[in-house]
Every structure is written in C-alpha cells, then in structure tokens.
C-alpha cells in the first residue's frame, strides 16, 4: 500500500502515529499527526541494546503525546510489534510508502543500513 494524503483521512488531526525502525545499529522514529505532518523525529544508536533505548524513547514520548498508534519495521520489527501491540511492516514497503508520501516526485530509494543495502526503483 502506498500512502497518500487520503491515507490519513481516517485519523483525527490530533492523532499521533509513530513509525519505528528497529535496526541493527539504531532505533529511528518519526511521530506524525493525523494529517501526516511530522511532529518529532529521532535517530538513536543503540549499541546492541535496542530494547533499552526503545523503552527510554517511548517513555519520553508518552510524557508529551497521548494515544500513540505505532507501526514497526526493521530487524527487530516482529518481536517489538508483538510487545507493543503494534503492526509490523516490511521495511521495503515502509520505505516505498514513506518516499511516495513525502516525495511524490521521487523515482528511487537508496537505503544503506547497518546490515544490508537496497536500491528500490519506484
């Protein structure tokens, strides 16, 4: 599924939607409002302790933003999604959706991660 402005039509404007990427090197996150506008983003190297970093980051977010819905991708996505009651999303699908939503004119995505690299032609 590729996201568009209408993808957010089911959310109230004051909703909080969190995208998490649990990678082999870092925990990356972006918090969007119900219109898809970024409210917060963070990149944190986890030094082999992704759960510890994720817990600290989520606790900080919960102090300032209530009612967060989450989707998780990356190396640890399935396990973290189960723990949080969130949905796990394949990382290529997440990258295509994000690039298409934020940069509709984009024709490709290059992802250089800690574990692998990918070229995606849109």
Describe the predicted segments one by one.
Residues 2-12:
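A short, basic/flexible loop-to-alpha-helix module at the beginning of a structural domain
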Residues 11-14, 65-66, 103-106:
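Short helix-loop-beta connector
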Residues 17-21, 69-71, 107-110:
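Short glycine-aspartate micro-motif
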Residues 34-35, 43-46, 61-93, 119-121:
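Short beta-strand-loop/turn "lid" adjacent to the catalytic site in phosphate-handling enzymes
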Residues 42-43, 90-122:
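Glycine-rich phosphate-binding loop of actin/hexokinase-like ATP-binding domains
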């Amino acid at each position: 599924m590729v996201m568009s402005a209408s993808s957010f039509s089911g959310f109230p404007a004051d909703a909080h939607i969190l995208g998490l990427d649990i990678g082999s090197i870092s925990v990356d996150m972006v918090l969007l409002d119900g219109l898809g506008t970024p409210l917060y983003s963070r990149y944190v190297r986890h030094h082999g302790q992704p759960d510890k970093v994720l817990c600290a980051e989520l606790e900080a977010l919960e102090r300032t933003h209530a009612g967060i819905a989450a989707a998780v991708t990356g190396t640890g996505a399935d396990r973290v999604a189960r723990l949080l009651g969130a949905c796990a999303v394949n990382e290529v699908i997440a990258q295509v959706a994000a690039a298409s939503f934020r940069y509709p004119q984009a024709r490709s995505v290059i992802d250089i991660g800690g574990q692998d690299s990918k070229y995606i032609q849109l």
